[in-house]
């Protein structure tokens, strides 16, 4: 009986030591916050781990290491991109991924052109170029994109040259008669950084279409800020 008890105790002790060693092996020195070492997101059947680069001597290289770009067009963007639109930092982006993207209540949008997106993006992002939101509201591509945001074209929506002209002139009847935003998803848009106007233009385009400002978020630091903090960047397949 004593031998069995000692044997069981020894097994438990060994298991405890192995668990501690295993935890130490995977412990990170460079965490996101004191309480969060990483965040995981699944996209297209693949799981991505958002964490910071662990090499503490790592330095930014390439285009995002630059401090100066010709302005215009690469001018500093305001902290508040539009009234009612919240501006997010990195922790809020990760929280949005965890709480909104994972539950299909929100979409993280890489608003850059496809060539930029192909070079690397934030895990969990969907590429919708800012140019899409400048299309005519009757354009099939825009209508399909809006459907992905759970925004449907109203069955009674008017269309045609005269309707589009009134919209351009700002004399179209409000509230928006064309789109139904009652079930619209929350959107968090980003681009290359605080000097990039792609996501601000996307947000302005969405607002012009009637998208509720309270459902739009802006990650101003964008890819440059994300890389400065050594956070995970994925290359789309």
Regions found by a protein language model. Give the residues of each.
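Catalytic cysteine-centered active loop of the rhodanese-like fold, especially the PTP/DSP P-loop
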Residues: 146-223
